[in-house]
Amino acid sequence: MPELPEVETSRRGIEPHLVGVTILHAIVRNGRLRWPVSEEIYRLSDVPVLSVRRRAKYLLLELPDGWIIVHLGMSGSLRILSEELPAEKHDHVDLVMSNGKVLRYTDPRRFGAWLWTKTLEDHPVLAHLGPEPLSDEFNADYLQQKCAKKKTAIKPWLMDNKLVVGVGNIYASESLFSAGIHPDRLASSLSREECEQLVKVIKLVLLRSIEQGGTTLKDFLQSDGKPGYFAQELQVYGRKGEPCRICGTPVVGTKHAQRATFYCRQCQK
């Protein structure tokens, strides 16, 4: 599933081609996504894009009278293409732009979403979200407070959007490895120093992934059709049985809450 770096990479890729440009119309080839494509999107006609933002794993396209909310789901990607390029099997939504380009949404598993809202504050998918991990609000004081009485393992807690948004399976595993913290540790067992280190490495790992265009394991593509190259830098994720890059101990691969988890039993305590 695309996580924060992949969504931010998509945002940065499409923004220069959309802001200040008019959406001539939308083409919805298959509206049966995770939720049905909102009727307002079918009716788009001659509306300018004012901004392209991101909240958590949602892309937000600001229009004069509302917002398009896009979620990439499990396998979605957005590309900027010539409007003359024919659509393929899994190309479900196009925004046809006045600059001769289209924003094309591709999603083999159709678990993404194209939604509409008049105001962001009113939409349920954006309610009750925690802070952005790259913001000043996400700091050691905040994490220590939220972990203090939490009797659950730290990895699923990091992946809870009520704690912090956008830290999915890949980046939770990678950040815990970089911080030297075992994914099974109770959140309440983390010391102040460990909270400081974990916040620091989460920010560093996410920023590094954004620099590399995100992580492509299967479906994700950047807006120019290139894969994300952070996959080449993964320390533990997807490396079950391979030697730890630090100590050489075989990387462990297990399941936590039905999600794959990877760690080094020697480096993470």
Curated annotation (Swiss-Prot):
| Zinc fingers typed FPG-type, residue spans | 235-269
The reactions it catalyses are:
Hydrolysis of DNA containing ring-opened 7-methylguanine residues, releasing 2,6-diamino-4-hydroxy-5-(N-methyl)formamidopyrimidine; 2'-deoxyribonucleotide-(2'-deoxyribose 5'-phosphate)-2'-deoxyribonucleotide-DNA = a 3'-end 2'-deoxyribonucleotide-(2,3-dehydro-2,3-deoxyribose 5'-phosphate)-DNA + a 5'-end 5'-phospho-2'-deoxyribonucleoside-DNA + H(+)
> Which GO terms are recorded in the biological process aspect for this UniProt protein?
base-excision repair
* SMART domains named in the record: Fapy_DNA_glyco, H2TH
Cofactor details (free text): Binds 1 zinc ion per subunit.
Cofactors needed by this protein, per the record, are: Zn(2+)
Active site residues according to the UniProt entry: 2 (schiff-base intermediate with dna), 3 (proton donor), 57 (proton donor), 259 (proton donor)
Q: Which SUPFAM superfamilies match?
A: Glucocorticoid receptor-like (DNA-binding domain), N-terminal domain of MutM-like DNA repair proteins, S13-like H2TH domain
Can you tell me which residues bind DNA? Answer: 90, 109, 150
This chain's protein is named Formamidopyrimidine-DNA glycosylase
Species per Swiss-Prot/TrEMBL record? Klebsiella pneumoniae (strain 342)
